[in-house]
A protein has these predicted regions:
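Hydrophobic, well-ordered secondary-structure elements that form the walls
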Residues: 144, 222, 328
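Alpha-helical transmembrane segments of polytopic integral membrane proteins
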Residues: 141, 219, 321-325
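Alpha-helical transmembrane segments and their helix-start/interface "positive-inside/aromatic belt" motifs
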Residues: 203-214
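Scaffold helices S1-S3 of the voltage-sensor/voltage-sensor-like domain
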Residues: 220-230
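Hydrophobic membrane-insertion alpha-helices, especially the h-region
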Residues: 213-221
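Pore-loop/selectivity-filter region of tetrameric P-loop cation channels
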Residues: 187-205, 228-314, 323
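Transmembrane alpha-helical segments in integral membrane proteins
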Residues: 312-334
Length: 335
């Protein structure tokens, strides 16, 4: 045990700094230190307890690895460039209470974690969870969510990697091999791409709103085209058998003519493409457009295609809305 601090500032060493299971009462200061250890740890601080804080700034690790596995420090004060790349850092299990004098943005911190969360080819999620916890406690909620999103993406990537390995071991059993490959493909499509893209694995729930707006825009285009080319009819059996509708039903754009200011349908719900698209895409909203108007498969190609597209937009809208609502609910519960 070290009752005071351990000051390694500006040292140059080719021997391992062994702090395994050491308790340091003060700081561990490695500012501007240079390490060049051929076949071992440059610093081995596994299970170390650093009560006064770890200062790791402007350090250079030419050769050797760093292990802070299961170490704890009250304060982390570092810069990203001092941590070596190439899988030479082990941060798994490392905990710290706060970050002072170091970067707090997600981009820089993710680059740091990328250096220290893979050890012997195996992904370790704990460094991401720890960083997110500290960032959230410090008030950096947005950066914390980005860190957790990246963690989950890498966890799923690791899961698929293990599935592929399992698939290789079951090549001699055709059914098991196909089942494993199918599971990996379905996992990639529905969990990774769908859930990740729409909600950031639940950590970016409001991202789904962008996709809803995009869906509304995409649905509004064929809706407008179908209306312009006479592909819509009133969504009412009573109106469709009425004499007023029958009198106009063979005109080029019967719906537009019937609902004009001088015709019987002038008081019917006015068609608006964006409102219709919103009604179509968002299932929890009822503006009244889809109740009033429906595309017809017998009134030209525009109406026919809109009839089919309405199913697509409705189903996709349900999926996006459901995932977004579930993600938002989850975030509210976590907060």
């Amino acid at each position: 045990n070290v009752t005071g601090g351990a000051f390694l500032e500006k040292i140059t060493t080719n021997a391992t700094i062994d702090l395994n299971s050491t308790t340091i009462g003060g700081q561990l200061n490695c500012t501007k230190a240079t390490f060049e250890v051929e076949v071992d740890h440059a610093v081995n601080a596994q299970d170390a307890k650093i009560n006064g804080g770890l200062i790791w700034r402007e350090a250079t690790v030419i050769k050797g690895t760093l292990s802070f596995a299961n170490a704890h420090t009250s304060v982390l004060c570092d810069d990203e460039s001092s941590w070596p790349s190439g899988g030479r850092v082990d941060l798994n299990g490392m905990t710290y209470d706060t970050i002072i004098g170091g970067p707090l943005d997600a981009k820089t911190r993710l680059a740091w974690l990328d250096k220290g969360s893979n050890w012997n080819g195996e992904f370790k999620p704990q460094p991401y969870t720890q960083l997110a916890k500290v960032l959230r406690a410090m008030g950096h909620d947005s950066d914390a969510r980005q860190v957790l999103e990246k963690r989950d993406a890498l966890l799923l990537k690791s899961y698929r990697k293990n599935l592929r390995k399992l698939s290789e071991t079951t090549k001699n059993t055709t059914a098991s091999h196909l089942a494993t490959k199918s599971l990996a493909a379905a996992h990639w499509l529905f969990v990774d791409k769908l859930l990740g893209t729409l909600t950031g694995y639940g950590h970016q729930p409001f991202r789904s709103l962008r996709f809803l707006f995009l869906l509304i825009f995409l649905a509004a285009i064929p809706s407008h085209m179908a209306w312009t080319f006479g592909g819509f009819t009133p969504n009412s059996a009573v109106i469709q058998v009425s004499d007023d509708w029958k009198a106009l039903s063979n005109t080029e754009n019967a719906a537009e003519e019937w609902s004009s200011k001088t015709q019987a349908g002038r008081d019917w719900e006015t068609f608006q493409a964006v409102a219709y698209a919103t009604d179509l895409v968002i299932p929890i909203i009822n503006i009244g457009q889809t109740d009033a108007w429906a595309p017809s498969t017998t009134r030209g190609a525009a109406g026919y295609h809109m009839w089919w597209l309405s199913w697509v937009f409705t189903i996709v809208g349900w999926i996006v809305t459901a995932l977004g609502a579930a993600a938002i609910t989850g975030v509210i519960r976590r907060d």
